[in-house]
Amino acid sequence: MLTGCGSSAISYFPYGDEGTGGRAYEKVTSASDISLMSDGICVLSDKNVNKLTDKPSFNAKSVIVANEESAIYAKNCFKKMYPASLTKMMTAYVVFTKESDLDRVVKINGEAIKITEPYAKKMRLMDGDQLTIRQLLNAALVTSANDAAKALAVAVSGSEEKFVLLMNEEAKKIGATHSRFVNSTGLHDNAHYTTLYDQYLIFHKLLEIPEFVKIINQGSYTVEYKNALGNKVTTKVTSTNQYLAGLLRVPDGYTVIGGKTGTTDEAGSCILMSFKSSADKNYIVGILKASDSLNLYAQLGTVFENLPQNASN
């Protein structure tokens, strides 16, 4: 079994057929900033790894911390889990892969994007609203709007059912072969599942796309569009990432690039996030099924506190 990170490492993985204050995040300003971790993919065995200082333990079900060279921490990365809104990363990847014009205007079909779950996050898009693909991507990734994710699916494939076929097809191409997607949102379905390693692969692939990195790097997003009557609608949404939203301060020596969060009762609180040290070293952290948001960010804090001493200098 090979382990480590490298541009060709993935081909060796035997994965089957199937507070406030301080600088909370770094603004990505040019394509040259977006190298991130697109050069090396970590290949893991099914054994847990702990190279963090003080050897902390995590009570989340699945955890990964990786840099360009190796996995620093890995726990239950191949365990079957529910992804919640991390699903929207795969939705975004399919859009980036299949849609040639991100500025194409989409007219919303209210019935096709209906969200019935009472507490699901929404932009409250209405029948006849007109938004671009780019605006819908921002809404789905920054604030995790479920109606925006469904609108993207319908815009690209004509229906969410057809779009889901593409999600599963593209996931297999990436190597995420232990996932099954049945919707574009991540709203719970027992038949909709993943592993943390699959989510790592999807996120890693997305970090190669400059537009994705620009979107996830935002603390908030303001969208202006026309409704069915031709009137302008302006909506400002806030990132679901508490570091980017300015609710938490990133420890000195590190800056957060961005990522995707997810929460359902069944999935718990989840995150995939990219950050880097002042030594310009890039990291990905993934956590699935923390007990709640407070616990999730406490565990992220533990990651920052226990990275090897030379990470931030």
Task: Give the residues covered by each predicted segment.
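Sec-dependent bacterial lipoprotein signal peptides
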Residues: 1-3
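Active-site-adjacent loops and short helices of periplasmic peptidoglycan-processing enzymes
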Residues: 9-197, 201, 206-207
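Domain-terminus/edge residues, biased toward the C-terminal soluble/receptor-binding domains
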Residues: 6-11, 176-177, 188-193, 197-313
